[in-house]
Amino acid sequence: MNEGKRSISLIATVALLLGFPVPALASWQSWEPEFAAMIENTCLDCHDDLEQKGYFRLDNLAPMHADPSTAKIWLYVYDRVNKGEMPPKKRQFSDAERNRFTEFLGEQLKAFDAAQERSVGRVVSRRLSSNEYENAVRDLLHLPGLTAAQYTPADVEYHGLDNVADEQELAYSQIALYLEAAEASLQAAVALRPKPDVEPIRYAPRELGAHRKAYRNAHTLVNDELVLIKEPMKSQGPWGLFTAPEEPGYYKIRFRARTGRMAYSAFAEAEHAGDDVPEILPGDKNQTVALGVTLGRFFDSFNVTPESDTYESTVWLHGNERLRIHCADLPLRSARFASGKNPDIWDAFVIEWAEIEGPLIEQWPPKGHQALFGDLPMKEWSEESGCLPPRSIALGTGDVREVSKPTGELYYIHSKNPSRDSKRLLRSFMERAYRRPVRNSEVAVMQERVLEGLDRNLCFQDAMLIAYKAILCSPDFLFIAEEPGELSGGELAARLALYLWRSLPDERLSNLGRSGSLTKTDVLRAEALRMLDDPKADRFIDDFANQWLGLDDIYSTTPDKRLYPEYEEDSFLVESMVRETRRFVREMIRSDLPIANIVDSDFAFLNEHLARHYGVAGVEGGELRKVKLPSGSPRGGILTQASILKISSDGFTTSPVKRGVWVLERILGTPPPPPPPDAGSIEPDTRGAVTIRQQLEKHRRNESCANCHQGIDPPGFALESFDVMGGFRTQYRSLEGGEKETLLRGPLGYQIRTALSVDSSGEIAGRQFSDIYEFKRILEEEERQIARNILNRLLVHATGAVATFSDREVIEALLDANEADGYGMRSLILSILETPMFLRK
């Protein structure tokens, strides 16, 4: 030990002699003397109260049983020492010392894991994530389009995962958010009004032209047809088709349209009729048209042809949402043509008529209302009814809710026997919400709330809504109730439903759980297969893809329109990017594809927009479909999908650091430690004078930065051949320096400046690569580590707990069992079901 360092044993001796209290021993000091000596003599020079190198201390760690969070620190120490990364070269352990160190520390970690499982279980009690809450309320109230997550407390994420129990927190102030979420959800389900009129409403273009002055040269009316030659807004639409329906629900949308061509001079007038009618020329190409409402909420797309045809889609509208059409292939209003002037004849999109029908109602009152009030009759309210007037109901299932203003009669739920009906309805609702049978005493507590409301002359439904609101805010609904040890059949049903549906078990799964049949391995696996084939499994697949890959960040950046004018607000392209990645993950799971497809594949899911973006010919229309990639394409796999390349960039420039960290964390599951506070940042150079590689070389001269960047930067360099939207490039762009060029996109021309050449070469783990192709070959050799990362993430989705040290042996056994088949994604999902981590709390 250095002379300047204080010996802990000496401090204790001096303190004792002087009559001062002896400092509490750190956890490692009470362990085996040889191990404690290795810590004191090798680690504390850099990691005590004086040095804290890397902002990391070992001298003051409490025992693991007193502070379970220290187990994560010791696990980190174990991994760094086991990999030979610590101690540093000057004080490296011999092989024998390293083996003794890791063997002893491993035993301590296993002992801690065993003690934790005996006392509280492998996973502590956790609450539903925001997505799980929303799905559960949707299923409880039979409202498939309900949005409720925005009302709930924000999830604390752990490496992108939102259901890690140890990271969750619930303050008293957050209860107000759940009260608001419950109120909004219940009101969306209540239907105290006559059945809405569902007659189709047809709109002629002349009636849709109320806002034509705002669009000016974007569209014109020719008799009863609407003709568009440019996107009406700054870019990809939207153009409103209808007034906003008040009622939430499914709506059937139909419109008759075709593509065409038209002389630009015809747009001199706002509309045309009678003898002054310009000719709409036949179209010579198909166009992609998409339906949506707001950014990130597209419903459907159509490949509209030159032949007049009717197009149809059924969509969920939240209420007070205006449906919009996006003419994704028409040029932007501000676009310049490569010729430098507007052409005489423009491509056009022609709408003959549009129609909306809905809400489409299977029954009235709807299922959600019946889940709350059964078949109790609805009556017109009057003062003679003996109860106070019913509260106004806010209509809608989205962010915008409008309070219903009765224009005539008020209605209320009539019960001849409120005591009996409330008990019956509450028990049914509580058993579904709590995911288990409920005790009579639990029902009685909630029923007391109803009876108190009735004593205050509330009408029956308002009194019941008080209890329903309490149920949706109770710990029994918000938290996962499990006892330490083997899970019961009912607990297994709840866990399996949250894993594969992110929601509640259905009636079949609940019955199998209550009967105990679900504890049989073959029954459990059969149910899992059934659930994966159910449409509700898309919730799991999309949620897993979003969290694993960070897809929710897709709209967090916008390309700078000066550097990347061709991408200006191209929301349909961005939406296509996200859908491509989700479809790819879905295909990997449905077809049990080997894990190597994450790195590279010979196919992609493309529509015309994405295919054009990727340089793949022969794809038409807005619908995604599986496309075989041409030989030599840099695409294939997840790594080079545009969504991934966008979320790992900002709007100005790409960052090898950000992309490198993304690859290490999301693909390999080996996230680097957080940067020290004094690490600084690198400002992008948009002048084109220096490359990001040159800036990083200067940054790495700082010794505290060099070690981490040695592992972070190479994957990021490999992806430098892709711009901020995932477009392939060989040169950087600049705002000032470089050469002026005209970038061609069909008939359009964009003025840009190209600067220095892109260098996507690098070296990782002693192996050199010259481009993305060679980097992929190196990364493919890490398929076991990639599969390990996927298993670890699936385990969190399934249980709510990060893998412990003791779980590692089981995970390695699962990897061994799946190695021969290339670690198929579906197989990995199912393999977790037979592990003690899934079958025990």
Per-region residue spans from a language model:
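Low-complexity, glycine/serine/threonine/alanine-rich intrinsically disordered linker
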Residues: 29-52, 69-76, 81-82, 93-841
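Acidic-and-aromatic substrate-binding clefts and catalytic sites of carbohydrate-active enzymes
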Residues: 64-67
